[in-house]
Amino acid sequence: MSEEIYSPEMKAYFESLQREIDRAYAIARKARAQGKDPSFDVEVPQATDMAGRVESLVGPPGVAERIRELVKEYGKEIAALKVVDEIIEGKFGDLGSKEKYAEQAVRTALAILTEGIVSAPLEGIADVKIKRNEWADGSEYLALYYAGPIRSSGGTAQALSVLVGDYVRRKLGLDRFKPSDEHIERMVEEVDLYHRAVTRLQYHPEADEVRLAMRNIPIEITGEETDKVEVSHRNVPGVETNHLRGGAILVLAEGVLQKAKKLVKYIDKMGIEGWDWIKEFVEAKEKGKSSEENKDESKAEDTGTESVAEKKENVEKGFYYELYEKFRANIAPNKKYTKEIIGGRPLFAEPSTNGGFRLRYGRSRVSGFATWSVNPATMLILDEFIAIGTQMKTERPGKGCIVTPATTVEGPIVRLKNGSVVRVDDYETALKVRNEVDEILYVGDALVNFGDFVENNQTLLPANYVEEWWVQELVQAIKDLYEVELQPFAENDREAVEEAAEYLEVDPDFLWNLLKDPLRVKPDVETAIHLSTVLDIPFHPYYTLYWNTLQPEEVEELQKALLGAQIEWAEFRKNRFAKKVVLENDKNIKRYLELLGLPHRLERVEKKRKVIVVEYPWSAALLTPLGNLEWEFKAKPFYTVIDIINENNRIKLRDRGISWIGARMGRPEKAKERKMKPPVQVLFPIGLAGGQSRDIKKAAEEGKTARVEIAFFKCPKCGHVGPEHLCPVCGTRKELLWHCPKCGADYPESDAKDFNYRCPKCDVELKPYAEREIKPADLLRQAMDNVKVYGIDRLKGVKGMTSGYKMAEPLEKGLLRVKNDVYVFKDGTIRFDATDAPITHFKPKEIGTSVEKLRELGYTHDFEGKPLERDDQILELKVQDVILPYEAGRYLLKVARFIDDLLEKFYGLPRFYNAEKMEDLVGHLVIGLAPHTSAGIIGRIIGFSDVLVGYAHPYYHAAKRRNCFPGDTRILVQINGLPQRITLRELYDLFEDERYENMAYVRKKPKADVKVYSFDPESGKVVLTDIEDVIKAPSTDHLIRFELELGRSFETTVDHPVLVYENGKFVEKRAFEVREGDRILVPNLKLPEKNIDYLDLLKEFSREEFAHLHDRIMVRGIAEWLRSVEADVKEDYLRRDSIPLSVLLRVLTEKEISIEEVPSCWLGFKRDKVRIKRFVPLKPLLRVVGYYLAEGYARESKSVYQLSFSMAEKEVREDLKRALREAFGDGFGIYERGGKVTVGSRILYLLFTEVLKAGKNAYSKRVPSLVFTLPREAVAEMLKAYFEGDGSALKSVPRVVAYSVNKALLEDIETLLLAKFGIRGYYTFDNNANRGNARGRLYHVERGTEAPVSKVYALNIAGEHYHRFFNSIGFVSERKNSIYELHAEKSPAQDRYSSQNGWLVKVRRIEYITPKDDFVFSLNAKKYHNVIINESIVTHQCDGDEDAVMLLLDALLNFSKYYLPEKRGGKMDAPLVVTTRLDPREVDSEVHNMDVVRYYPLEFYKATYELKSPKEVKVIERVEDRLGKPEMYEGIKFTHDTDDIGLGPKMSLYKQLGDMEEKVARQLALAERIRAVDEHHVAETIINSHLVPDLRGNLRSFTRQEFRCVKCNTKYRRPPLTGKCPKCGGKIVLTVSKGAIEKYLPTAKMLVTKYRVKDYTRQRICITEKDIKTLFENVFPEKQRTLMGFSADICEKMVKERTGHSNGKNGYLDEFNGKNGKASKKSGSLASKLSGKGKEPSKKKESAKPKRSEKVKNLTSFEAAAKNEQARGTAGNAKKAESEKPKRKKRKGISLDEFFGS
C-alpha cells in the first residue's frame, strides 16, 4: 500500500504489528520444521500486498512483480498507464481479441489506481466491448458497460474508470465515441428519470451538463438495464435496452460530473490529453457557484425580514402543532418488531409511543454502527434485562442493534411506591431506587448514530431538545450579540471566555467548563433563566419538562391548581423564580406532574392528608414556562402546550419529547470459550474404547484396543509404523501410508504417487487412511514420557476423524491441553467467542492497562492531542487493537501457558508468552474470525474490561467478511412434504424472527415445514436435512461465477467453500482456489415417490388460501345428498342444485362430516354455467399440464379467465382436447381457431395458476411441485406432452432439444423429472434467437428501428440419454417419434461424465462478476453442510458460528487443513488466510456511514425538523468522506462520553432466570411498570408468536422423532425390535421427551388467565392442551392429569359462556370436579371464580383491543392466590378486599394519534 495514506504514527503502528507478526511466524516455522505436524510449514498464509491482490483478483498472471517495480519507480498513477502499455504490447501473454486486451487493461489499471480495492475494477465494470459508430462514419470505438452496484465503488473510482478507458482506447488505436442526438437525449432523460423514479442522486446534473459530457467523453458510458423503468427515447442504435441503465447513470452523474474537480488532478498527473473540456467545466462551475452565493446573500438582506413578517400573518396553527401534523402524515409507527415477542425477552417500548426510548442523535465512544448507547441507569431500572452487549430489535432506523453505556445521556424518570417522582440519571441513584419503582414514566434516551439513518435510508425524525443543541444556540447568540467567537465542546481562549462571561454576568470558570463539557456541566436553574432572558435563547433542556405530553386543557387545570398552591419565591438578576411549591394531592394534578416528568414527592401534613411538594430547582422549572403565573394559560385550537407558552411567555421552550422509538430485547450478550459438542482435548480417534466420554486415558488404563479409521505413517529408515509424523525410534520424518480398500495393501507416499494413487494390483483408488488397530496404553505412555505430563484425570478424544486424510493430532498436544484446562476446536486451534461491540475511544483505567505500557504500545497522546500522563485521559483506539472481556483474558492466559508448554516440552523451543497474569498478554496478537468468513484479521490486545463483549474498532468488526450466494441462486428444498426449487431469497422469506447478529441478518424460525436436500459423501445419496438458520448479509464487492461443462453454472462470494472431487474423494476449496479443470458433482437424485390417482378440486379449493372465494365458488350436483344429511341450507340452493362452498363447509363442520364423505360433484363460479368435475384423473391432467408448460398461457381480465394453447399440428390439438375432456369433463367449452385452443373457466385458471402454481406466461411457468413426487409412468405423460410442444428431435444428429426462454423451467424438467429415468442433459444458450428471422429484420430496417433480441435456452439430450428418452418417454406425434428410427441403430457415445454418485463435470471458465443485489444469502444445513443449487450442483453452504478470537501463535502452530472435516462444516470458519493490515476502504461499507464529528451542527437539527432524508444532509462528516486519506485511520471524534465503558449490568437477567414461567413472569411484571408498554398486547404476542408455535412444533417433533442409544449415541428412525442397540447393546431412549412438549403449557395458561387476550388465543391454548393430552393418555400412565392447577379451567369457562352449561366430561379440570379421585372444587375458590361458576356469564362482548388494566404490582402464582383466598375466607371477602385497593390506570401520555384527539 502507498505510504501517502498513513500518518507517520500510523505507519509506525502498522510496522510494529508486522514485526510481531513476523516474529510469531518465525517461531512457528521453526517448530513446524521439526516435522511433528501434518505440514512442514505454517498453514495460515498472510494476505498479499496491493500488487499481489491485483494479480490474484484481476490478473494477468505475472503482473504483480512488475507493478511493484513500476510503482516504486513512477508512482501508482504513471505505473497504471505503464502496465496498460505492457498488457496491450503482449508482455503478459496473448489474450486474443482487441476486446480482451481492452478489458484486461482497464481492469488492471483501475485496480492499481484504487490501491487494489476490489469494488472498482471488478464490481463496477460488467463488460468492455469494441463497437462501431454505425450512425456516423462506422469507425470503431470503446464502450464500457457498468452495473448498478457501481455506486459502492465511490465517485472517484467511477470517474477514474472512464479516464483509464480513454487511455486504453488511444493505445489500441480506436476512434472516439461519436454520439448522435438520440444518444445524448436518451442519457439526459435517463439521468432525470433515475433521480425521480429510482433513487435520488448525490449530484443531479442539469440537462446541459449531461449534454456537454456526452459530446466530449471519448468512450461510450453504457450498461445493462438495472431498473424496470422504461424510457421514452427507445430503440436508440447501439443501446441494448429500453430501460434505465443505472450503472452508466451513476458513473456519468456521480462520477465524471460530480468528481470533475478531482478528475482534473488525475488528468494532469497522468498526462492524458483531450480532456480540456472538463477543466473548463470545473472553472465555469466554480465561478457560477460564487456568483450564485452572492446573489442569494443580497436577496436575503433585501427581502428576508418582510417574508418572515408575511409568514407570521398567515399562521393559523402553532409551530409544534404543524410539526406534529407533518410528522404524523409522513412517518408512521413501524410495528414490525412487535410482531413477535419471545418469552422472557421484554418489550421495552411500543412503536413511537411517548415514554419509550427518547431519540437522541449522536455517537458515543462505544458506538459505531447498529449500536444504541443508553444510560446505565436505564439498564438497571429495566430489571437488568438489558446488559452491555445485549441485542435489541428496534423500530428504526435499523432492524436491530446492540446496547452500550453512555452516562451523558438521560436516564429514566420513575414513580416510586411512595408516590415520589425521581429522575434517575446516574447509576448510584438507580441502585438505590431500583426495588422501589412503581411505574417507569420515561424509559430514557437512546443515542443513535446519524450514520445508521444514512445506512438504512430512514427519514430523519424531529430532534428532541438536548444540551448539545442548546450550547450551540448559546454560542451563536453570544457571537451575534457580543461578537465573541467561542466553540462548543472545546477548550476556548481564556480571554474570549472572560469577555463573554463579563457580558453575561456569569463566572468565567463556569462558562469555560460549560463550553468544554456541556453534557456534564449544567447551569443552575436561575442561571438558565438569566441566560435565556439575556440571550433570547430557549430554556435549558435539562429544566424543560415534557409539556407537549399534556393536552392544553390539562395545563389549564394545572395552572388553576398552582394558583392555590403555597409558593416560596426567590430572585436572581431581577428574575423571579420559585424555590418551593406545595400543592394539594389531587389525583389528576398528580398525574399531570408525573407526565411532565417533574420530580416531586408526597408529604403527609395531617393524619390522612398528603400534599405534593416540588423542591428547587424543579419548582422553577415548573413555573417559569407558565410566566410565574403572571399570565393566564388558555387552550387554543391547533396549538400545542408549547405553542401557547411560546406565544405568551418571555422565555421560550423547545420540545424535548417529539420523537420516540420502540424496542424489544433480542439475544443476550455472549462471551465464553468455544468448545466442540461434546468438548474435546485432542483430535485423536478412540472409537468405542473410550466409552461415552471418549476418554483415551480410561481406555489405556483398561488395556483396551481400539479399531478406528486413521492415517498411519511409515519410517523410511527403520520401518516403524504408527500415527506419529516423526519416528519415535529414530527421529526420521515418516511417509504417509496409502491403503488399498480392496486388497488391503499399504504403499508409502512416494510409491503411491508413482502409481497415480491407484493400487497396482487391483486398480482401485488408494485411500490415505484405513481401519487400523491401535493400543491407547502404548501411545499414551509414550506421549506422557515425551512431555513429562502424568497425573491427568482424563484425556478426551473423538470417536472418529471426519477429515479427508484422517490424520490424528499428536497426543502430546492433548496432554498439555489437559494440564492447562483448555479445549480444542475442529481445526486444531483454541478459541474464545464474544459478541462484537464497537469502540473508538477508551481510558487506560477502563481496560486495566498502565499508562507506561500504553506508551510502549504507541499511545503517546490523548484524543485532544495532549501528552498521555493520567489513566483517566481519553485515547483514540488504533484500528487493529482489541479490548477483550475478563472471561477471555482468563481463558487466553491458560492458552498462552499451553502454547509455552508446547514450545518448551514438545518442540524444545524457548517459551514465548511467559504470562503469569492476564495483563501480561497486553501487546500480544490475536486472530479475529467472524461467521461465514474465510480470512481472519490480526488484532492486538491492549487491555481487558469487565463485560461480556469483545470491544474493537468498528473497522475491525467490519473487516470480518461473510461468504454466501446471490439471492437468485436456486436451491432444492422440501416444503410441507413437496420438493421445490426456489431461490435463496424466497427461502429467506420462508423464515421469520429476524435478528441482526454480527453484521448479518439471521432468521431461525420457519413459517412452514422446510428442509433442504444435501449430498451425503459417505453413502453417495441425496438426503433431507434440517435448516438451522438462513442468513442475509451485505454483499461483498464482487462474486466469482463458475461455468461448468454441459452449460451449468453458479455464483458465490470469493472465499466461499466449494466441494470438488479430487484424488478419489470430495474436498473443499475456497472459491478463489478452484481452478479450471476441477470437477464438481451433479448428484443422482432419487426422491421418494407416491402414486396418486386423481386430484380432488373440492379439497384443494377448501383450503384457507381460497377463503376469500368460498362465497363465490359453487358446488353442484349434491342436492340429494344434502337432503339425506338434513343439512340446514336455503331451499333455493337445493332447488338449483348449486350451493356456495362456504355454506357446504359450514354444514360439514356442524354435522361433523369430513370432506371425503361428500359425493362426486362439479365446481363452478356463481353466475357462471361452466362446471368442472371434482375428481380430476391424474393421467389426462398431466398431459394437459405438459402442453400448458410448453405452449400454454393464462389470461385474466375483469370478467374473463382463460387458458390458451398454441399448437400447429392437428394431431396434437386433438390429443389436447381429448385430454381436457378426460380430465375435467364436458361442463365447459373448448374453442379452436387456427392453431390456437382456448378454454374459458375460472376454476381451471385458478387450478393452473394458484393450486398447481404452474405460472401464467413463458417467463413464470414452473413444474408443479406435485409432479416431482409422482412415479415414472405418470411423469412420462407430462414430459411426452411438454417435449411435443417445446421439443424437437433433430434429423441430422441423434439429439432431442427443448427450447425455452425460462431457464428455471428447463432446470425443473432436467434435474427433477428426466433424472427419474436416468436421463441427463446439457444446456446451451442463444443470445439472439431472432437473428434468422429475415422478414422480421427487414421490417425493422425499413422503419429504422432495432430488431428485438430474444434470449433462448436449450436443453439438449444426446448420447445414451437420447436412446433412454425415446425408450422411456418419446413424443406424442408420430412425426417426431419416427425420427428416432434414423438413429436407433447407432451406438451411443460413452458418457464420460458418469460416476458412482452422479455426473462429475469440470469447471470450464471462472470469472469475477459484479453482484446484482446489495445482499447475499446462505443457510446452515444441520447435518451435511452442503446444498444442491441451480442445475443440481452440489456445493458447500456457510457456517454460522460466533465471532471468535485465538492467539496468533496458537493458530500458526496448531491449525492444519488436514484436521478440517471433509463434510460437517469443512473449511468454513477456519483461519485459512490472515489479513495483516486493515484497509478501511475494503471493509464492509456499512461502517463508511459512521460519523466522525465532535457534535452535530445547528443545520442538522434544523434539517430534522424538515424531515429530510439523511442523504440530503451534508453537514456531518462521515468515514466515507475520509476514505483514501490519512484521516481515515485516525482523528475520529465522538459526540457523547461515558464515565466507564464497563458501567452497567454485566449479564442480562434473562440469562440468570430459571425456567420459562419465571422468565415470562418477570417480563410481564416489567411490562406492567413501563408506561409505554401495553402488557396485554405483550401477553397476546408471546402466546401467538412463541409459546403456541413451540408447543405445536414440539408436538409434531414427538411424532417424528428418532431413537438414540445412550451408550454409542447411534440414532435410529425406528426402535430396534430387540429394544437394544445392535451396535453395542446399549439402551434405546426417546430423543424428544414428554416434558419437552409440555414445558410451556403452564406459562401459556397463566398468561391467558391473567391478561386480557382474545378468545381465539384462549381457544388455541385449549386445543393444544387437548392435543397433548390425547397423544399421551395412552402412551404414558396418567399420574397427574393437569399441569395448570387453579388457572386451568379456561376452556370450561368458555364452554359455559357459550352454552350455559359445563361439559365436565370433556373439561380440563375433571380432577377438581371430584373425578379421577382428585380433590373437588370449593365454591369460593379462585379456580371456581375463574371458571365462571356461581355467576351469570357476561353478556358484554370483549373488544378486539381491550382497555388497559389496573396496575398489578406483583406476579404471584395462581396456586398461591388460591391459598390466600382460602385463608381469608370466602371469595366475596377477597373481592371486597380487592375493590378497596387504590386503583391507578396507566396512561401512555400522548402518542401521535392521541395528540389531535378523536
From Swiss-Prot:
Q: Where is the composition biased (Basic and acidic residues)?
A: 1733-1753
Work out whether the entry's keyword set contains Nucleotidyltransferase.
yes
Q: Report any one BP term from Gene Ontology.
A: intron homing
**Gene Ontology molecular function:** DNA binding; DNA-directed DNA polymerase activity; endonuclease activity; single-stranded DNA 3'-5' DNA exonuclease activity
After translation, the protein is modified as follows: This protein undergoes a protein self splicing that involves a post-translational excision of the intervening region (intein) followed by peptide ligation.
For this protein, what is the EC number? 2.7.7.7, 3.1.11.1
User: Where in this protein does the record put region Disordered?
Assistant: 286-309, 1699-1798
InterPro entries the UniProt entry points to: Hint_dom_C, Hint_dom_N, Hint_dom_sf, Homing_endonucl, INTEIN, Intein_C, Intein_endonuc_central, Intein_N
Keyword presence, Cell inner membrane: no
Keyword field: Autocatalytic cleavage, DNA replication, DNA-binding, DNA-directed DNA polymerase, Endonuclease, Exonuclease, Hydrolase, Intron homing, Multifunctional enzyme, Nuclease, Nucleotidyltransferase, Protein splicing, Transferase
Q: Which SUPFAM superfamilies match?
A: Hedgehog/intein (Hint) domain (SSF51294), Homing endonucleases (SSF55608)
Q: Which PROSITE patterns does this entry report, sorted A to Z?
A: INTEIN_C_TER, INTEIN_ENDONUCLEASE, INTEIN_N_TER
Give residue ranges for domain DOD-type homing endonuclease.
1184-1319
Against Pfam families, the record matches this protein to: Intein_splicing, LAGLIDADG_3, PolC_DP2_cat, PolC_DP2_central, PolC_DP2_N
Q: Which reaction does it catalyse?
A: DNA(n) + a 2'-deoxyribonucleoside 5'-triphosphate = DNA(n+1) + diphosphate; Exonucleolytic cleavage in the 3'- to 5'-direction to yield nucleoside 5'-phosphates
The residue ranges flagged as biased composition, category Low complexity, are 1714-1731
Q: Which family does it belong to?
A: Belongs to the archaeal DNA polymerase II family.
Q: How does it assemble?
A: Heterodimer of a large subunit and a small subunit.
Q: What does this protein do?
A: Possesses two activities: a DNA synthesis (polymerase) and an exonucleolytic activity that degrades single-stranded DNA in the 3'- to 5'-direction. Has a template-primer preference which is characteristic of a replicative DNA polymerase.
UniProt-recorded name of the protein: DNA polymerase II large subunit
- Look up and give the organism this protein is from: Thermococcus kodakarensis (strain ATCC BAA-918 / JCM 12380 / KOD1)
